[in-house]
């Protein structure tokens, strides 16, 4: 048995570089796993390089044998007290950084929403009136109420009320003579019902909803000043401007979608033109 073991050691070959004892007699060998045969032995230096490639800079990552899946037993020299404390601090910081980054991101979004809410209040109510209202309000109410303004605007923008109006239009347009007189042919039956695109599948919808919701107070203020300049109250003028803008924009959108619907319904596929024989 000792002779057989000695013969196996003399015949050992590194499964990384395929070198034998005859190629390098000074190389250090290691048997790190349960493998037998040609994959039993490996150079210490070759295995170290292979482990470095697998760990990719993370010295704490576990590495296993690719053949038998046995985990390599990797040990390090003992650290001194100073190095141990520094290593522990480095690990704690690495684990805490993702949570800190998430907290910073959430905090940035929150204070951006607070700032937007304050600007919106001053824009809708008036600069001086808005500042006076916020100065007299409870700070806790401001910290909770101001960031809800952009949230409510976005949620309100997500309500697709034009689609409900469009369904009612298509359902009762043939019964309302006033619609037929204003829009001739609107209540005529269509040859087929076209397939409509799913609004959730539109990749532009999210950005349009966000931009439209955040710009809405400014548009409502401008429309209110243009159409209801006789109203003295800034708040009432802005509310009326917002209602007018939503109504006018919704009417155009409903009409545009209905015309697209009719265009798709009357779509026709032509015969392929036959080529004249030579």
From Swiss-Prot:
Subcellular location field: Mitochondrion outer membrane; Endoplasmic reticulum membrane; Peroxisome membrane
Disulphide connectivity of cysteines: none
BP-aspect Gene Ontology terms: negative regulation of cytoplasmic pattern recognition receptor signaling pathway; positive regulation of cGAS/STING signaling pathway; positive regulation of mitochondrial fission; positive regulation of NLRP3 inflammasome complex assembly; protein autoubiquitination; protein K27-linked ubiquitination; protein K48-linked ubiquitination; protein K63-linked ubiquitination
Assembly and oligomerization: Monomer and homodimer. Interacts with MFN1, MFN2, DNM1L and FIS1.
Reactions accelerated catalytically: S-ubiquitinyl-[E2 ubiquitin-conjugating enzyme]-L-cysteine + [acceptor protein]-L-lysine = [E2 ubiquitin-conjugating enzyme]-L-cysteine + N(6)-ubiquitinyl-[acceptor protein]-L-lysine
InterPro entries for this protein: Znf_RING-CH, Znf_RING/FYVE/PHD
Species assigned in the record: Homo sapiens (Human)
EC number: 2.3.2.27
Binding site for Zn(2+) 1: 14, 17, 43, 46
Protein name per the record: E3 ubiquitin-protein ligase MARCHF5
